[in-house]
Regions:
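Fungal secretory targeting signals
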Residues: 1-21
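Metallo-beta-lactamase
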Residues: 110, 117-119, 195-197, 202-304
C-alpha cells in the first residue's frame, strides 16, 4: 500500500511538473521590473473611480487586461467573421473581429471608415458586406483612414484602384502611408477642425495624436429610428510605447473629451470591436425590446468619463513601464 502511495505521489508530482512546464510555455506572464508601484496604484484606482460600474468593462480592458495580460487582450480581437449589420439608421458595421470598418449612407454615396488589413480583406469581407446590405463597391464615394496602422489602411489601395473613392487622412498619416509598399495613393488631407458635409451628414474632424502621430477623430450625428444622437469616434485608443507619445495621447483624449462635451456626444463608436464592445452590442440589438435603450448610446457623462479614464490608463501603463510623463 505504501509503495502504491509513493508511486501515486510521484505520478502526481510528475504530472504537476509537466503541467507547469506546459503552462510556462503557453502563457507569457507579464512583469514590470521598472514599475512605479505607488504611481500605478494611484492612477489605477483613479481610473477605476472615473469608470464607475457603468464603464467597468472598458476599464478592465484598457487598464488591466491589455497591460497585464496582453495575450488575453489580443485574443479578444482575433480575426473572424462578423455579419454586417445596420447599427443606426444608415450607419453600418462592415468589418471583422480583428478590426472594424464602418459605412455611412449619406444619400450621396457611402462614406467608409477604414479599409481592413489588406486587399484580400477589402475584396473578400468589406465589399461582400456592403453587397449583403444592398450596396455595391461603386457606392463607396469617400474613404476615411483613421490612422496609419496597416490594419486600418491595408485595403485602401485596392479600394482606390477599383472604385476611386476620395480618400482622406491627416497629414502625418499620409506621410507614413505613402512610404509603405501597397499603401494608398495620397489624396485629400484632413486638418484639425475640418468639416466635411456629404449628402445629409456632416463630419467634424480633429487630429488626435498619441496612438499614432496621425490619428484622426470625428464627431457626427446618428439616428436611432429617427431619434437624433451624436457619435464620437476616437481615432485610436491603443497605448503607445514612447513616453512622449503617451503624453500626446493623454492630451488628445482630454481635448477630445472637451470637444465631445461641447457637441453633446452621447454615443461611442470605435475602430476595434473590443473598444466599443460591438460584439456585445450586436447581440443586445438582436434582442432589443420595443423602446429599449440603444447599447451604443452611453450618455454624455459616460462618454466623457470613457475618454478621461482611457487617459488615466495611459498613465498607469507609463508607471508600469517606469516612465515619467510631462502631462
Amino acid at each position: 500500500m505504501k509503495t502504491n502511495a509513493v508511486k501515486l505521489w510521484s505520478l502526481c508530482a510528475a504530472l504537476t511538473g509537466f503541467a507547469e512546464a506546459q503552462f510556462q510555455d503557453f502563457f507569457n506572464i507579464t512583469t514590470f521590473p521598472n514599475e512605479q508601484k505607488e504611481n500605478v496604484t494611484k492612477w489605477l484606482n483613479e481610473a477605476r473611480a472615473t469608470a464607475g460600474p457603468a464603464l467597468s468593462a472598458y476599464f478592465g480592458h484598457r487598464c488591466i487586461l491589455g497591460q497585464v495580460y496582453p495575450e488575453l487582450s489580443s485574443a479578444t480581437q482575433l480575426s473572424g467573421f462578423i455579419a454586417p449589420r445596420e447599427v443606426f439608421d444608415n450607419l453600418y458595421y462592415i468589418g471583422q473581429s480583428a478590426v472594424s470598418a464602418w459605412a455611412y449612407d449619406t444619400g450621396e454615396g457611402l462614406v467608409v471608415f477604414d479599409a481592413l488589413n489588406n486587399a484580400a480583406e477589402a475584396e473578400g469581407i468589406l465589399v461582400p458586406a456592403l453587397e449583403k446590405l444592398g450596396f455595391a463597391g461603386t457606392d463607396i464615394k469617400h474613404l476615411v483612414i483613421t490612422h496609419e496602422h496597416f490594419d486600418h489602411y491595408g485595403g485602401a489601395r485596392w479600394l482606390q484602384d477599383n472604385f476611386h473613392p476620395a480618400t482622406y487622412a491627416s497629414a502625418p498619416a499620409w506621410a507614413a502611408m505613402v512610404n509603405v509598399a501597397g499603401g494608398p495613393v495620397q489624396d485629400k488631407v484632413i486638418a484639425e477642425g475640418d468639416v466635411l458635409t456629404i449628402g445629409n451628414v456632416t463630419f467634424n474632424f480633429y487630429v488626435t495624436p498619441g496612438h499614432t502621430p496621425g490619428s484622426l477623430s470625428t464627431i457626427f450625428k446618428v439616428y436611432d429610428n429617427g431619434v437624433e444622437h451624436t457619435a464620437g469616434f476616437y481615432g485610436g485608443t491603443g497605448i503607445p510605447s514612447a513616453a512622449a507619445a503617451k503624453d500626446q495621447q493623454i492630451a488628445s483624449m482630454n481635448r477630445f473629451a472637451d470637444l465631445a462635451k461641447e457637441a453633446n456626444v452621447d454615443t461611442l463608436i470605435a475602430n476595434h470591436q473590443n473598444q466599443d464592445r460591438s460584439l456585445y452590442h450586436f447581440d443586445l440589438l438582436d434582442h432589443r425590446p420595443d423602446g429599449g435603450d440603444h447599447p451604443y448610446v452611453i450618455g454624455g457623462d459616460a462618454f466623457d468619463r470613457y475618454l478621461r479614464m482611457n487617459g488615466q490608463c495611459v498613465r498607469v501603463k507609463a508607471a508600469r513601464d517606469g516612465q515619467f510623463l510631462q502631462t
